[in-house]
Amino acid sequence: MKHPFPQFPPILVIYCFCMLQIPSSGASPPLAGPPDGLDAVDPERLAHFLNQRETCSNQPKESRDVYKRFLFHYSRAWKSTHPVNSEFAPVHPLMRLAAKLPSRRMKRLPRLLHTDSRMATIDFPKKDPTTSLGRPFFLFRPRNGRYTDKVQ
């Protein structure tokens, strides 16, 4: 089997010789038009492209300015139109209403149990201290099963 490597250099030399353009006068003639497959660059299109590129480079600065305006508009540094109550911590308004729920519940319960209503009166049994095994009554369970007083 013959190796293709010894034949490779002569083929390369022939290919390069065929592709070489030897001008007769010693200087190559200037191109009359753009080579095939390449478009000539229009100066107006080039200026438009460069202008767009410049505006894209300024875009982070503009977005930074918009962000600063947003922060300035929504910051509490300026004087607000509504007076801010300083005794309350800044919490959601519904959380402020949650503190008023037990008192509203207690006001509504006697109305429901009123004798004029058609509902039957409900007697709530009172807790005696023996049923709670000496533990105080908690609205919520103590964390991790711990008791407030050391009862074991």
Swiss-Prot record:
Expression induction: Expression has a diurnal peak under light/dark cycling, but remains stable under constant darkness.
UniProt keyword annotation of Transferase present: no
The organism's place on the tree of life at top rank: Eukaryota
PROSITE patterns hit by this protein: NMU
Disulfide bonds: none
Compartments in which it is found: Secreted
One GO cellular component term noted in the UniProt record for this chain: extracellular region
Keyword presence, Chloroplast: no
Keywords: Amidation, Cleavage on pair of basic residues, Neuropeptide, Secreted, Signal
Residues with PTM Asparagine amide: N144
GO MF annotations, alphabetized: G protein-coupled receptor binding
Annotated propeptide span(s): 27-69, 70-105, 106-108, 147-152
N-terminal signal peptide: 1-26
GO biological process: locomotor rhythm; neuropeptide signaling pathway
Tissue distribution: Expressed in the CNS, spleen and testis. Specifically expressed in the suprachiasmatic nuclei (SCN) of the hypothalamus.
InterPro entries cross-referenced by the UniProt entry: Neuromedin-U_amidation-site, NmS
Biological role: Implicated in the regulation of circadian rhythms through autocrine and/or paracrine actions. Stimulates the contraction of rectum and elevation of blood pressure.
Descriptive protein name: Neuromedin-S
Originating species: Rattus norvegicus (Rat)
Gene of this entry: Nms
